A protein has these predicted regions:
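A C-terminal functional module that forms or caps the active site or interfaces directly
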Residues: 171-228
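Short glycine-/acidic-enriched loop or helix-start segments at secondary-structure transitions
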Residues: 18-21, 85-87, 104-105, 225-226
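His/Asp/Glu-rich mid-to-C-terminal helical/loop segments that flank catalytic regions of hydrolases
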Residues: 223-261
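Short, acidic/turn-prone active-site loops that include or flank metal/cofactor-
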Residues: 33, 54, 98-101, 218-221
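Mid-sequence, gly/pro-rich, charge-dense loop/helix-turn segments that line enzyme active sites
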Residues: 85-190
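N-terminal short beta-loop-beta anion/metal-coordinating cradle
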Residues: 1-71
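Hydrophobic/aromatic beta-strand patches that form the interior of the parallel beta-sheet core
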Residues: 50, 76, 94, 166-171, ...
Length: 261
């Protein structure tokens, strides 16, 4: 029996999404309510990519829209991320085994910050879990897709090796962390390899609907190595490169899902 349900992609930025919907892919984009949806197929596999905009609220809202309207077989997220560890370089790719909403904290009366690892509960009203495991089958399929694949080198810098694929925890919040001690704290607390502003929110909504989820990120900056260049020149480079390698691995994953259809 052929599964006709689509795969939904929730992607923050057009600069990321465009690497997957290349000219000649047959992709068609139209608004569905407020959401730009791009539809294309990989073999028999229907794909709907929704550009959510940046941030936890926007990506959660886009995911709820996607699931309620399209009843997907799974939800995928890809894009760029900032490293939480020193030995990653721009161009490295992370298969997210977990996503954590790392800004879900309590600041107690002493000023100490305590991560709320599970619930904020008042009566019967809870926020829910803040750590979300990716679907095991999708992780395994992404690992298979990454075998014998070499991500393209980052065009600038002096990385001592070619980009590589890793697996680990993605941290998410409406925060861009540049302070080295804070990066170290987040990595120690959560074992995060990198941070973005969407994955955990998408994972939470997908989990509420029991829809399998996976996130794939590529490293666009490592503040331990070089402070992010916010100049026009630096922004121009990022616009060209962000999400490119994560998109390529996502396409390889989609091709394998199409074969299994």
């Amino acid at each position: 029996v052929i599964d006709i349900r689509p795969v939904v992609l929730v992607v923050a930025m057009q600069s990321e999404l465009r690497h997957l919907t290349l000219p000649g892919s047959g992709a068609l984009t139209a608004l569905n309510g407020i959401w730009p949806e791009t539809r294309f197929s990989i073999g028999p596999l229907p794909v709907i990519a929704i550009r959510s905009g940046i941030g936890m609220v926007a990506s959660a809202a886009a995911t709820e829209h996607a699931i309620s309207h399209h009843r997907p077989r799974c939800v995928l997220n890809f894009g760029c991320a900032g490293s939480h560890v020193r030995d990653q370089y721009p161009g490295d790719v992370i298969i997210g085994t977990q996503s954590v909403a790392h800004a879900t904290v309590r600041i107690d009366h002493t000023g100490e910050e305590v991560f709320a690892s599970n619930l904020f509960t008042v009566g019967q009203d809870g926020q829910g879990a803040n750590v979300f495991a990716s679907d095991g089958e999708l992780v395994a399929l992404a690992q298979e897709a990454a075998r014998d694949w070499q991500p393209a080198p980052w065009p600038v810098g002096d990385a001592p090796r070619l980009p590589e694929v890793r697996e680990g925890v993605i941290g998410s919040a409406d925060v861009w962390t540049q302070h080295h001690p804070r990066l170290d704290l987040l990595h120690k607390r959560h074992l995060t390899l990198c941070e973005d502003m969407e994955a955990a929110a998408i994972a939470q909504v997908a989990g509420l609907h029991n829809v399998p989820f996976l996130t794939i990120k590529d490293i666009s900056n490592n503040e331990f190595l070089d402070a992010t260049d916010f100049s026009d020149e630096g922004a121009g480079l990022l616009e060209v490169e962000v999400g490119r390698r994560a998109a390529e691995l996502t396409r390889r994953l989609l091709e394998r899902l199409a074969i299994r259809n």
